[in-house]
Amino acid sequence: MTELPKTFDPAEIESRWYAHWEDEGLFRPERTGAEPWTIVNPPPNVTGSLHIGHALDNTLQDILVRHARLKGKDARWVVGTDHAGIATQMVVERQLNAAGSKRTDFTREAFVDKVWEWKAESGGQITRQLRRLGCSMDWANERFTMDEGFSKAVLKVFVELYRQGLVYRDKRLVNWDPGLGTAISDLEVETKEVRGNFWHLRYPLADGSGYIQVATTRPETMLADMAVAVHPEDERYKALIGKQVRLPITDRLIPIVGDEHADPELGSGAVKITPGHDFNDFEVGVRAGIKAGEMLNMLDAKAAICQTQDGLVPAELIGLDRFEARKVIVARLKDEGFLVPWTDKEGAEHDAEPRTIQTPYGDRSGQVIEPWLTDQWYVDAATLAKPAIEAVRSGATKIVPKSWEKTYFNWMENIQPWCVSRQLWWGHRIPAWFDAEGKPYVAETEEEAQAEAGEGVALTRDPDVLDTWFSSALWPFATLGWPENSDPTLGGRYSNDVLISGFDILFFWDARMMMQGLHFMKEVPFKTLYLHGLVRAADGQKMSKSKGNTVDPLGMIDKYGADALRFFMAAMESQGRDIKMDEKRLEGYRNFATKLWNAARFCQANGIAASKSLEAPTAELAVNRWIIAETIATVXALDLALADLRFDEAANCIYQFVWSRFCDWYLELIKPVLQGEGVAAAQAEETRAVAGWALDQILVMLHPFMPFITEELWSKMGPREHDLIVAKWPMADARALDPSAAQEIDWLIRLVSEIRAARTELNVPPGARLPLHVRDASAETAXRLIGQEAALARLGRVDQAQGDAPAGGGA
């Protein structure tokens, strides 16, 4: 036994023990023949730093991993980072800009080399921070989504999907980010409410018989208008369907079409249709018989005005930024009499009607997104989604909380083709080559593509890379050695046991892992999907840098210790709810760690050391039989809570047991025994053995939540055969439950509590002793009073019980 200091330093303990665990390989102990248990971390961006959401996500995972390891399973937590195509390229480009250069000053190969250099120098920040949190990850097998083995898996998946007709090239509208110069997914678009305008325009009928009025928030897109739509049952316009209008500025003739997209109750009931720059208009255009290749495009990759295929855009507009062009076009429409003024409530006329507009922004660039018509690679997500839907319906994968199933089904049943090509330099290069006619040849190597194209056919490599989420969708099996490892269960590691994920990446990542895992492995990627909420500011607002209300988890670790932060996350994680950040609670859980530390110091001071047995000692004293039963009941409750992923219930269960039952009551109740107040030496020895055993079980049970302090106390309480991280989880043996001891000690606790309440009510000084009178006591109560005399005297500060009660007194 090593004497514990009066206070403990979390920082010193944390760094020392984490280094020990990792150096000794204790995150992956050799357990030949043990039941495999596997979880994968959502790979953080290699550019990232630990935020409070990471702290929650990884704490919950580590609790499950450590619990599984303590239960004797061959627990493996697969760890790695994501190459984060857009984010990483942005970081490196900013670094180049700061040095006075830009990406296009380099060849593609030279720029990619720069990114690899950056990763080698700066890419390990997030993994160092995960270590500070105490994450017991399999660092010896750390993966990266651009490492050689993983890249082979990505290429194989793309090529196989292409050969199966599930990857194809198509000209469709995409979310184009002009700031980044690439397509982005719907999930990377952030819609914001901004102050904008409705402009009302008058389009003249080609036959000169009148006008049709339309309204738009984007008048500049009229340069690529290809139709005006009206509802086919709208009596005002039925006679106009099939006629043409002559567009102002371009003088283009476009048809009036009947389409139910037009709402007779909204505005004039007539809608301008720009199929090359609006997702709804694209569908209207297709229904009107306009092929994608015929749809007009009026913007270049930087969202500046360009010439349309029909050459009708005036030269003076070409090259203008889209928003500058808007001003010029509105002014010209007004000058030529095609702008209909809007009249406000006071009767004043204005060029436009003020409106709040739902506007799409790129979540990384902050630029307004343009629907842009371009050739891209797509995955047939609807086909891949069908088995993924059925897997959840059948229970092959269970979603917790179950309420998220409806959201999952709704998105998967209405899923759109997945655009997987990105116009970047950093990422998995698409394995496709084109001949002079633009025909693609998809293969894992250029040699295979050339063989398919034929000798002498000149091929050019597709410059695009794959969406980062395409590669990370393979994470549950590509990290385990697929495709080189052809074992369908990947050594018993697939399917993973559970996935812990924020609900915000349910569609980005979780659903796509379901699709790819089922397609290539013929089995679900994880048996359970647990979706947690957000960590919000104390007032319930969403955290954001712009609001200045973010919380740095590393700052919280510095202030309160990693154990306190971890326990806070577990205690506050209630299924289906967000967490409100509360520093007072963090402080409270630091105090909880201090209370445990002081309890261990008390044990040392009273000759209580590490237990010599996993099994509970034999006990005769009621108080010892009681704490053994309470310990076993806590084990059973913890196992149930963790099996149900009720992290808050698990944390509360162990907290109440340690603070209240063990520290506040048991240690106080055994003081008379330990200090020899009229008890036999055998009883004191029994009590030391039971107390040491109970403290050991506490350290084991609490270890998944607070690994650092528990490991430190485990090592200091006496010699051990092994570290706590690989100890054995207590057995919930129902035979240890003892109703008679529970009744007696619960009676004692109630009696002491009543005495203390009476003392407080009567303002009795804390040090004053009171006489204890008893009336009409049963034989059982009388026996208990005698047996618990020392405990009553110490805890209630009362004298020996007298069998008479004063007149008017209570029994």
Swiss-Prot record:
Cytoplasm found in the keyword field: yes
Gene Ontology CC entries for this record: cytosol
List of residues binding ATP: K545
Primary localization: cytoplasm
UniProt EC number: 6.1.1.9
Pfam families, alphabetized: Anticodon_1, tRNA-synt_1
Motif ('HIGH' region): 44-54
Keywords, alphabetical: Aminoacyl-tRNA synthetase, ATP-binding, Cytoplasm, Ligase, Nucleotide-binding, Protein biosynthesis
Subcellular location: Cytoplasm
Keyword rRNA-binding: no
UniProt free text on domains: ValRS has two distinct active sites: one for aminoacylation and one for editing. The misactivated threonine is translocated from the active site to the editing site.
HAMAP family, alphabetized: Val_tRNA_synth_type1
Family: Belongs to the class-I aminoacyl-tRNA synthetase family. ValS type 1 subfamily.
Protein's name in the database: Valine--tRNA ligase
